[in-house]
Amino acid sequence: MFCLDPSSGGIGRSVSSAPRLFTPSVRAGIGVDADDFQLSPTACSDRFSFHLLRPDSNLIRGYWRLRRSIFCREQNVFECSDRDELDAVAWPIAALQHGPVGSDVDDSDGDGGAEVDVVGVVRIVETEPRLWYGGRLGVHSAFRRHNQIGKGLIWKAVTTANGWGCDRFLATVQLQNVRFFKRLHWMSIEELEIRGIRHHLMQADLSYYVPAKQQRPSLQLTA
């Protein structure tokens, strides 16, 4: 496994060659390669990478913290915790930012430009053989101007499931995000109301989401 700095002309292929602020994943024990920056078949991010998390990663705490912040404190969809029975069998995915928060980032939450490792979350779960759902998709409020994060999380989620064996990949998408998903090769199946919030049940076009090379771990990742 090697570290990749996509913003430089040269590629750093060792931990020592990667700047400290560029490699929160390396500092957390996660290797980084080119596929982790993928956003689509033809586009990559230059600031964010996307990772399946393992239970021994200290990024797991950031994953749960961001989920709670978005779905409990901000959206009030849940009261104290957004965790449910699916988390016991789901695979957590996190988006990482590389470097300090810049002046182009909305700092309305008062982060004060502090470094934030986990800036986006999503989970995937196989509810039946080869039937996958994505859920709990969210982006840190200070980074929502960066459409790359949501795009990269969706790409990572669907391509991972497609690589592990997937005939259908579904998600319940809040109404305000339906247009964004349609641009990413999803189709709406039906409109739903969940906890008083309008959603669409949507399905990904698997022919667009090239199966990822990452092998399915033998043990579940959530701790």
Task: Locate each region found by the language model.
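Short alpha-helical functional segments enriched in proximate histidine and acidic residues
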Residues: 70, 160, 180
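Conserved GNAT acetyl-CoA-binding A-motif
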Residues: 161-174
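Conserved acetyl-CoA-binding loop-helix of GNAT-fold acetyltransferases
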Residues: 139, 145-159
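Short, well-ordered beta-strand micro-motif
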Residues: 94-96, 201-205
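Short acidic/glycine-enriched loop/turn segments that link adjacent beta-strands
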Residues: 87-89, 128-130, 195-199
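Short amphipathic alpha-helix that is part of the acyltransferase structural core
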Residues: 2-92, 96-102, 117, 213-218, ...
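Conserved active-site alpha-helix within GNAT-family acetyltransferase domains
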Residues: 175-198
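Conserved beta-strand in the GNAT
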Residues: 94, 104-109, 114-126, 130-138
